[in-house]
Amino acid sequence: MQEPAITPEVIENHGLKPDEYDLILEIIGREPTFTELGIFSAMWNEHCSYKSSKKWLRTLPTSGPQVICGPGENAGIVDIGDGDAVVFKMESHNHPSYIEPYQGAATGVGGILRDVFTMGARPIASMNSLSFGEPAHHKTRQLVNGVVEGVGGYGNCFGVPCVGGEVRFHPAYNGNCLVNAFAAGLVKTDMIFYSAASGVGMPVVYLGAKTGRDGVGGATMASAEFDDTIEEKRPTVQVGDPFTEKRLMEATLELMQTGAVISIQDMGAAGLTCSAVEMGDKGGLGVRLDLEKVPQREENMTAYEMMLSESQERMLMVLKPELEAEAKAVFEKWDLDFAIVGETIAEDRFLIMHNGEVKADLPLSKLSSSAPEYDRPWIEVEAPAALTDADVPTIDPIDGLKALISSPNYAGKQWVYEQYDTTVMGDTARRPGLGGGMVRVHGTDKKLAFTSDVTPRYVKANPVEGGKQAVAEAYRNLCAVGAKPLATTDNLNFGNPEKPEIMGQFVGALKGIGEAVSALDMPIVSGNVSLYNETDGQAILPTPTIGAVGLVAAGEEPILGEARDGHVLLLVGETIGHLGQSALLHEVFNREDGDAPAVDLEIEKRNGEFIRNNRDFIKACTDISDGGLALAAFELAEAAGVGVQIDASDTPTLFGEDQARYLVACNFDQAEALMIAAGQAGVPLETVGKFTGDTVKMGGSEATLEELSQIFRTSFAEAVA
């Protein structure tokens, strides 16, 4: 079959700029074949090369005494003691989920799970951070239902508990939803596997499901803006099979026990191309592939299609040749394909053969580590003016609370997480619903806590403070359950980086994130960048999602209790009443003005340590973020089924979103001891109310807990289900 001619239109359709194509001509000294053009397109797009973000990603703190493996591998790895490690990462599947919600979300879950078990870890927890357009938008309901069903359909069948996440709505996501999937797994520190190939002449083995035409060009599609041709992109969305993935995991983990694996890589974005190139490049080797040996489920597939297919549930491995028979037997037992499709070579070449013909012969290193890198122009985002006294609204406290909990942004998300299996594997210690999730480390007394956080309104208004706040809120959510924060993964979702104002958001957010993870000892060990989240020139809110992991060590107790009638309600931290960019302004007054709240990282660290160090006095705890004191107190009361009385009455005190604050419930006879401890630690602590009865009282306003709970538990489904 004759390959298509290389024309300017073909080059543009592959997402390559004219200067990038000129660079290809310079590198290889000739016109590329169609297959070679596809390979360059896949490896040089934003999704695989990070060409617009790499400069700034290097500024992030990624190391620490607890870090075993930082960015650059399939996932990050952190030591949790006793020969155990946690492996985790967050990654986006935004563009596919907007085009085909169910499969886009499902394969996003599948991809992140493969990243974890490729390292030798058994997945133990998942989360997802979802962003959709306004509820009334004509696509939102379809997207919400499809994405949630896809996340649940894949994760439930695979058998990993969903322990947390977030769901938000904003008109800026009308044209681009965000689906950020997180997974974590456990591995013994002496059984970690990496992707760098080693040894010349070693067999390159294809593992898992067969290759089809689904997902061809998916990575390139994920690196471009949307326009009115979006429906034509549907064939670029992958199709997942969670039962095959489950078998692939079991076979892979069993294979690793044999000692046959030299290196291993999952096939994700750009499929066979990216996995082979990354393995070779990290090992300083070349790779030769014979495509007629690739297991195929469709007839007459071309070299181009096989190299760029993103069919799911596939892996690539470099194998010890003397253990081939043993390795093959493992995969045959699990009814999965096992095929030697090539070998490592000494030369820096990526050589692709198909039926005896050379389809690609390229310098391998130029496809990966030497790919183009841009220093995009950027404009520093000028923070808006702070609210003046005249700008600050007032509202009846209960009316304000009702407005918040009737919005799908702040209503209970039961409709979402009840579709997910949250307890499979039997180690879930805290299910989704309030703050961080938690799982027990099986066979030990240790527990791992997980959270996912970002407030995009803050990041748009003030990227530096918004970036800090995303990390700080993750830190607080871990401290609030008694876990010591260990490390983070970032999922950086932004618009078109070729626009200086968008690049300015990115640069500012990374500056804030970097400062925060350094100050709070939470290095970034893995992550993902998703750019070009725009439709017809309209960008999403900048959404740098932070996933974080914390540890409750053996011998420590987590803070997982509930408030009880008679408990005192105490507020940790200083209240100023900052309403700029607040949930109240947005949901009630349709305003997004004022600056984002300032984040003092020293105070964040001090207050978080105070919570962890005084866990014996604390019966229940939550951090204060969106919705301020009022929403946090209601959520504690609603979770416990007991009323709450709050002494404050003014709007800024009740709904302000000052940072570094927590609400804690404690016994009346222990409140004084907690006050003394706070004084010794230099931490502001004040009594702001008590848990009692069956009503929620704020100032002179009140409503029954039953009425408010009904609103809280039904509003989400009524809006979007």
UniProtKB/Swiss-Prot annotation:
Q: What does this protein do?
A: Part of the phosphoribosylformylglycinamidine synthase complex involved in the purines biosynthetic pathway. Catalyzes the ATP-dependent conversion of formylglycinamide ribonucleotide (FGAR) and glutamine to yield formylglycinamidine ribonucleotide (FGAM) and glutamate. The FGAM synthase complex is composed of three subunits. PurQ produces an ammonia molecule by converting glutamine to glutamate. PurL transfers the ammonia molecule to FGAR to form FGAM in an ATP-dependent manner.
Top-level lineage group: Bacteria
Q: Which InterPro entries match?
A: PRibForGlyAmidine_synth_PurL, PurL_linker, PurM-like_C_dom, PurM-like_C_sf, PurM-like_N, PurM-like_N_sf
Q: Which HAMAP family match?
A: PurL_2
- Describe its partners and assembly state: Monomer. Part of the FGAM synthase complex composed of 1 PurL, 1 PurQ and 2 PurS subunits.
Q: Which UniProt keywords apply?
A: ATP-binding, Cytoplasm, Ligase, Magnesium, Metal-binding, Nucleotide-binding, Purine biosynthesis
Cellular component GO terms, alphabetical? cytoplasm
What this protein is called in its record is: Phosphoribosylformylglycinamidine synthase subunit PurL
EC assignment: the record states: 6.3.5.3
Assigned protein family: Belongs to the FGAMS family.
Q: Which reaction does it catalyse?
A: N(2)-formyl-N(1)-(5-phospho-beta-D-ribosyl)glycinamide + L-glutamine + ATP + H2O = 2-formamido-N(1)-(5-O-phospho-beta-D-ribosyl)acetamidine + L-glutamate + ADP + phosphate + H(+)
Q: In which pathway does it act?
A: Purine metabolism; IMP biosynthesis via de novo pathway; 5-amino-1-(5-phospho-D-ribosyl)imidazole from N(2)-formyl-N(1)-(5-phospho-D-ribosyl)glycinamide: step 1/2
Q: Which organism is it from?
A: Ruegeria sp. (strain TM1040) (Silicibacter sp.)
Residues recorded as binding substrate, renumbered to this chain, are: S92, H93, N94, H95, R114, Q238, E310, S311, Q312, S530
Identify which residues the record assigns to the active site. Answer: H47, H93 (proton acceptor)
Q: Does the keyword Nucleotide-binding apply?
A: yes
Q: State where the protein is found.
A: Cytoplasm
Annotated positions binding Mg(2+) 1: E91, N528
Q: Where is ATP bound in this sequence?
A: Y50, K89, D490, G527
Listed binding positions for Mg(2+) 2 are D115, D266
A Pfam family this chain is assigned to: AIRS
